[in-house]
């Protein structure tokens, strides 16, 4: 019986069935706890789909960079891009049919999802303040092969645009720095002539 529960809880059938047919909890507290513990935060199916798609399009990246706020799922330092791959339920995707609220323990889930959304907003703001371009990819955007392909193409384009913007900023910074050095040199030369 335990083997059956383990395989059932780990399958996508369980999650899809519960979303379509909400029902009272038929599992014991320990069984429910086991099912919930099998839900991962890293290397999720949507995250792997995005990684495979980006790799196939020629991008190279870092995973779960814990030196950045919020440990973004995918980081492309060359382009200055941090990608968050969010599950619609766990991150409270507004207007999404997959972001349903559980029927039991409603207060707990509303508070938890609200906290998750607030944490995401703070993390994104912090990353942007550090100069990163933050892209959020939602789980629902990756459902279906044609939708997945078009979303990954759009994501690749957004990454390239962010990289171009980063290059322009670097060039401006270098130019301004060079101009500042020249201006400082001129001021020092004038000062030396006056002495």
Positions of PLM-derived features:
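Nucleic-acid endo/exonuclease domains
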Residues: 14-195
């Amino acid at each position: 019986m335990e083997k059956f529960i383990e395989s059932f809880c780990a399958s996508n059938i369980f999650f899809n069935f519960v979303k379509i047919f909400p029902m009272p909890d038929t599992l014991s507290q320990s069984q429910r706890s086991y099912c919930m513990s099998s839900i991962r935060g890293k290397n999720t199916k949507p995250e792997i789909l995005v990684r495979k798609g980006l790799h196939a399009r020629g991008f190279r990246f870092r995973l779960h960079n814990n030196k950045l706020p919020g440990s973004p799922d995918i980081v492309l330092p060359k382009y200055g891009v941090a990608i968050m791959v969010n599950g619609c339920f766990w991150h409270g995707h507004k207007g999404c049919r997959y972001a349903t609220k559980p029927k039991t323990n409603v207060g707990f889930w509303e508070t938890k999802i609200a906290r998750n959304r607030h944490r995401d907003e703070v993390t994104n703001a912090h990353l942007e303040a550090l100069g990163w371009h933050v892209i959020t990819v939602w789980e629902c955007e990756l459902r279906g092969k044609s939708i997945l392909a078009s979303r990954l193409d759009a994501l690749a384009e957004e990454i390239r645009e962010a990289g171009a913007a980063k290059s322009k900023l670097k060039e401006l910074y270098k130019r301004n720095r060079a101009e500042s050095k020249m201006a400082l040199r001129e001021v020092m030369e004038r000062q030396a002539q006056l002495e």
